[in-house]
């Protein structure tokens, strides 16, 4: 299939711009441009890698939260959010020069930009539907799994299908206008279409969702259960303020640059406009690592409590069925990792006081575990010595980084951190 006149003209103009740019620049300027492009690629690659690890962590948290038996509608929205975030991460890595450096093709570039916008629009819609679903369920006191009906799950499926179709339709203008960016060696929306791109994205990402949520919140203000909803509404406000800070600077700057510095008047080297655009683009890329945290924050009314209870249940089951010192150490390491996720979710969804309480809870968990042993009675000296040795190992696992004192004469196990001392109920009694 032969390329169209528009594609041929666009590629020709881009190649001519690149030839003229390199012809008029000196050796130092060429080295500076290469360094700037390398810095841009490094930032995109770093954020992409961190975002993939973060997304895998969110998937692990969702797998742990299945213990709480969440509603089917919540699982439908959350797993589609994971899929849309994966599309966004993959497309962003491709469209910003990481993998297109050796194969700058206009058709592939437009396809990547199209997938990126589909992931972006669908993410905004899935978050909107999840928020509206949970706000309605909490306000009516039907936010538990046994309250859900077949109609709730059916509506969630229809909403997901509608979101994907609408996202594909809204991303068509991007597929039609995308072009190669020889300045940053990637893909971009041409500067002359920046105003249209700003209008579409601000309406889908912020305008329409905030109107729908505010209309629902105004109605909930007159509900009898409004006190149960306000903490969730606070998380919603945090989410949209975060989106405002991540999305608006880049798209507004593109419009401003199109007015102050049209594409025909752009210089051959990198100027202040290019560095400001790099900063706003980096801020936009941070959405790939920040937005997945809100999947857990919107999962339920008390997501950190549900995550903590679910993981405690799984750890208890594992400790009952798993044997060996290494397995117990691995379980404790996973437990500490989940506490880190809880603190991150608390930071984006609750107040500073709740974060402090979460830190206090995680630091004192070993003391609660140390007091859960049972009274053991021994009859011989050998059994008594074996029990003391086992108590030392158990206490060192439950209270890492503390001073352990196991005394057969005093028949007690102590965990001390300088301020608190906890004695377990596991005693040694010689008959």
From Swiss-Prot:
Would I find Transmembrane helix among this entry's keywords? yes
Task: Extract one GO cellular component term from the record.
Answer: membrane
Location relative to the cell: Membrane
Name of the protein = Uncharacterized protein UL78
Membrane-crossing residue ranges in chain numbering: 42-62, 74-94, 111-131, 153-173, 202-222, 236-256, 279-299
* Keyword field: Glycoprotein, Membrane, Transmembrane, Transmembrane helix
- As recorded in Swiss-Prot or TrEMBL, the protein's gene is named UL78
Question: Topology relative to the membrane, per the entry?
Answer: Multi-pass membrane protein
> Which residues are glycosylated according to the annotation?
105
Q: Does the keyword Disulfide bond apply?
A: no
